């Protein structure tokens, strides 16, 4: 017999049962025996601790969660569909808005896929690749700072929240200097970067690294030296290696089980195999282990950022192929709009053909050979994969993202059922889902 499930509902005509499977008489008896304490609670979608518009449907018996489900889709933006109506280069401005806390990873994954389809992945200038790694590691820092800050705030640790956002602000200032924006950068483009690092950027990053190395021990003291913080996180949101494998969980959730799986080591991209860093793991399988992993990953990211700064050499930041490359070495003109004479000369040259080519490249875009490819990068939340399909045109036929927040959120039920209602928030915070990435 299939397992039965009944939910009784009182109406003006008596009790109405909604039933799936099972024998009718047994269903009515089991529903009649249902405990008075059993209650269904909606946590979200506007609950302050649901990390955006996440809805959690909890069935609770007293203080214990007996069943937990996620309701997603409140932040659906149709980004994957929109990409099918834009050129390959314009796609960057869309993907950067998915997981809005890790924009550089979205852009990098997408651009690596497009470059692989074009067959130019070995022609990307070294300087562009190093700057990509630099920005991704700064982004890993800023994402983990938000995870730790919001996670602390939900436990009532407001100091750690203030510290987290204070340090993240320094990173956002660096983004603003380099890309002009604090988020939604569209800075990584197919073939390279939108433009080179501005004067003063390297010095500002070095200053930040120095400050951050000094500030990181504060998080250690605030959190690991705080018995209340530890008591609220230890043995909460438990998910072992078998559970992670079954659910496809990646990132800190997977590494908290002791498996050192990091795509930067297992499937290196952007030259990560040449950088010296460690993959932190824990063996606790709980929220506290994930917190410690994020803390240690921030230290490793600072190491990689320092190595990037030491490697930077002058050079181009866009491929030489004029059929693909948008103008990237731009200078700001006297009108403040980038319309400098050098810039105009570079586009127009002295021939009408050069201007026609530039016009076609920007309006129509370049063609990508018909093929499909899957590329993945290690985002702060786990494996961010992108499946890009081209039909030979100037626009993608299909772009699908494997967002780590979406996959990891499936583990919510396994982490929460059987635990306390108060621990649900801690478990969700340890996954660190961003709904922009989940719903896309």
UniProtKB/Swiss-Prot annotation:
Q: What class of enzyme is it?
A: translocase
Q: Name one GO molecular function term.
A: NAD binding
Question: Which locations, inside or outside the cell, does it occupy?
Answer: Cell membrane
EC numbers for this chain: 7.1.1.-
Its keywords, alphabetically, are: Cell membrane, Membrane, NAD, Quinone, Translocase, Transport
Quote the InterPro entries the UniProt record gives: NADH_Q_OxRdtase_suD, NADH_UbQ_OxRdtase_49kDa_CS, NDH1_su_D/H, NiFe-Hase_large
Any one annotated GO CC term = plasma membrane
* Entry membrane topology: Peripheral membrane protein
> For this protein, what reaction is catalysed?
a quinone + NADH + 5 H(+)(in) = a quinol + NAD(+) + 4 H(+)(out)
Q: Which Pfam families match?
A: Complex1_49kDa
**Assembly and interactions?**
NDH-1 is composed of 14 different subunits. Subunits NuoB, C, D, E, F, and G constitute the peripheral sector of the complex.
Concerning its family, UniProt says: Belongs to the complex I 49 kDa subunit family.
Function field:
NDH-1 shuttles electrons from NADH, via FMN and iron-sulfur (Fe-S) centers, to quinones in the respiratory chain. The immediate electron acceptor for the enzyme in this species is believed to be a menaquinone. Couples the redox reaction to proton translocation (for every two electrons transferred, four hydrogen ions are translocated across the cytoplasmic membrane), and thus conserves the redox energy in a proton gradient.
User: What is the designated name of this protein?
Assistant: NADH-quinone oxidoreductase subunit D 2
Native source organism of the sequence: Streptomyces coelicolor (strain ATCC BAA-471 / A3(2) / M145)
Q: What is the lineage of its organism?
A: Bacteria, Bacillati, Actinomycetota, Actinomycetes, Kitasatosporales
């Amino acid at each position: 017999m299939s397992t039965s499930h009944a939910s009784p509902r009182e109406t003006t005509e008596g009790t109405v049962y909604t039933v799936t499977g099972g024998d009718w008489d047994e269903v009515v008896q089991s529903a009649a025996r249902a405990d008075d304490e059993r209650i269904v609670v909606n946590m979200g979608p506007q609950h302050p601790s649901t990390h955006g518009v996440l809805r959690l449907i909890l069935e609770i018996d007293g203080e214990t969660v007996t069943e937990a489900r996620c309701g997603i889709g409140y932040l659906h933006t149709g980004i994957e569909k929109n990409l099918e109506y834009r050129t390959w280069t314009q796609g960057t401005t869309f993907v950067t808005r998915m997981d809005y806390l890790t924009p550089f990873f979205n852009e990098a994954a997408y651009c690596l896929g497009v470059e692989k389809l074009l067959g130019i992945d070995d022609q990307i200038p070294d300087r562009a690749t190093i700057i990509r790694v630099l920005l991704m590691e700064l982004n890993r820092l800023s994402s983990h700072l938000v995870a730790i800050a919001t996670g602390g705030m939900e436990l009532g640790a407001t100091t750690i929240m203030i510290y987290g956002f204070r340090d993240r602000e320094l990173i956002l200032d660096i983004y603003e200097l380099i890309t002009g924006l604090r988020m939604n950068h569209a800075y990584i483009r197919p073939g390279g970067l939108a433009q080179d690092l501005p004067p003063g950027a390297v010095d500002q990053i070095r200053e930040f690294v120095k400050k951050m190395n000094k500030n990181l021990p504060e998080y250690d003291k605030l959190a690991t030296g705080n018995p209340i913080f530890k008591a609220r996180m230890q043995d909460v949101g438990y998910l072992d290696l078998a559970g992670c494998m079954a659910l496809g969980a990646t990132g800190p959730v997977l590494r908290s089980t002791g498996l050192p799986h990091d795509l930067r080591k297992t499937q290196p991209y952007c030259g990560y195999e040449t950088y010296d860093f460690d993959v932190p793991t824990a063996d606790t399988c709980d929220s506290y282990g994930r917190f410690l992993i994020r803390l240690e990953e921030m230290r490793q990211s600072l190491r990689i950022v320092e190595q990037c700064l030491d490697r930077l050499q002058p050079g181009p930041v866009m491929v030489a192929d004029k059929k693909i490359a948008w103008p990237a070495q731009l200078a700001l003109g006297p009108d403040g709009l980038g319309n400098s004479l050098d810039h105009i000369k570079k586009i127009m040259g002295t021939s009408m053909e050069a201007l026609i080519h530039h016009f076609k490249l920007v309006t129509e875009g370049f063609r990508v050979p018909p093929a499909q490819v899957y590329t993945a990068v290690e985002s702060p939340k786990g494996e961010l994969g992108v499946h890009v399909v081209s039909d030979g045109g100037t626009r993608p036929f299909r772009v699908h993202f494997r967002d780590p927040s979406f996959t990891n959120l499936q583990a919510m039920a396994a982490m929460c059922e059987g635990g306390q209602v108060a621990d649900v928030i801690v478990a969700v915070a340890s996954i660190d889902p961003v709904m922009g990435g989940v719903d896309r």
